[in-house]
Amino acid sequence: LDSFIDIRRSYAHVYEKEFSNIEGIILPKTIDEVKHARHLFPIILDTDKLTINRNEFMEAMKKENIGTGIHFPSLIGTHYYSKTYNYKEENFPNATFVGERIVSIPLYPKMSVEDLRNVVDAVKKIINYYRKKWSTGLVH
């Protein structure tokens, strides 16, 4: 078990290094004093800076032969919470923001280094392709 955790941590470190300066991705925060098992590697898509939403990103990843998942949906908008407690998504903007944008990318101990590189390359390719191109505001 410890060796699997070490591998996942190592791969998570690669993701953090590769994606840390990519505009359009928000990475999970880590605390140095906490020994995280890195069971999953979720990223948040900053859709204000992209021309695609999470579902379109997931479809683009699928076309690159890379699976993704939604492991942390917001519970605020579910039938139970809306009916039982009268919760409305607009009253929980942070949960709604994350719930609509979070996606898990592959992270498992049997991944090869080539698999890891393929995930990194695919994420960068898709994010770079769909990043909003900011205009200068000048009229041509």
Residue ranges of predicted features:
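PLP-dependent aminotransferase class I/II
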Residues: L1-H140
